[in-house]
């Protein structure tokens, strides 16, 4: 893959975000953690608006990790209630704006009411194409890769796949978001410098961008700063800078 095929005029095709800092935002205001999660909904809508305005094709948000089930029961319960309310409140408007909604992760761990709404949101928006919004809920990157490996094992056991044919492309077909380009830009708010088991396979060549800003305070100016920094980087995909420059020139002439 050349750098020129990954983006259009420096605009990433796919942005992935870890929305971190809800609890600290609330603690600084001496409020319960759930208040931080409620405040973070504004930043989610802002990012969706931004992607629609800039023509970014895909946005993936890490909403709830597989490890988050281990948090205190009252916090998990409050988060599930917020999640349910958000599905009821936002999906119709997302559909009206041409957003396709999808959920990745272990859906079976949610209660029946949430699963039904997730399924309904995906059915309602399946034909939309302005923005592919993927919400990682009860998701873990290692879990994702393990599930892909199990799928390949089934194909081998059923005689549909020769083990000698298992390569990166074969596994890529079975991980989450297989129908989307890999994320070009990863953003994490809240100051931590790690990917926290998020899209481990998909982030192999993604540009990483971190900010100390807590998620409820994330705004369009910061998102634009992330895009500006992304546009200034040279993405080499394992090649030398000279090779990338030559490929970019060739692509420009061909177009």
Spans of model-derived segments:
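Flexible, compositionally biased loop and terminal segments
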Residues: 1-255
């Amino acid at each position: 893959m050349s750098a020129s095929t990954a983006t259009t005029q420096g605009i990433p095709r796919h942005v992935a975000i870890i929305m971190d800092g809800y609890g600290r935002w609330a603690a600084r205001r001496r409020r319960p953690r759930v208040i931080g999660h409620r405040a973070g909904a504004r930043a989610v809508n802002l990012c969706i608006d931004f992607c629609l305005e800039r023509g970014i094709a895909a946005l993936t948000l890490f909403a709830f990790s597989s490890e988050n089930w281990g948090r205190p029961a009252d916090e998990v319960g409050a988060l599930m209630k917020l999640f349910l309310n958000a599905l009821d409140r936002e999906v119709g408007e997302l559909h009206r704006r041409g957003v396709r909604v999808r959920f990745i992760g272990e859906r079976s761990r949610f209660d029946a009411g949430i699963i039904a709404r997730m399924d309904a949101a995906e059915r309602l928006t399946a034909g939309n194409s302005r923005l592919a919004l993927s919400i990682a809920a009860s998701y873990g990157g290692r879990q994702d890769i393990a599930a892909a490996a199990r799928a390949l094992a089934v194909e081998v056991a059923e005689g549909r796949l020769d083990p000698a044919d298992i390569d990166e492309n074969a596994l890529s077909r079975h991980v989450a978001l297989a129908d989307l380009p890999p994320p070009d830009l990863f953003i994490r708010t809240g100051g931590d410098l790690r990917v926290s088991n998020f899209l481990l396979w998909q982030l192999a060549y993604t540009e990483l961008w971190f900010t100390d800003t807590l998620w409820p305070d994330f705004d369009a100016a910061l998102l634009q700063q992330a895009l500006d920094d992304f546009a200034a980087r040279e993405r080499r995909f394992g090649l030398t800078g000279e090779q990338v420059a030559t490929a970019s020139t060739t692509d420009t002439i061909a177009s």
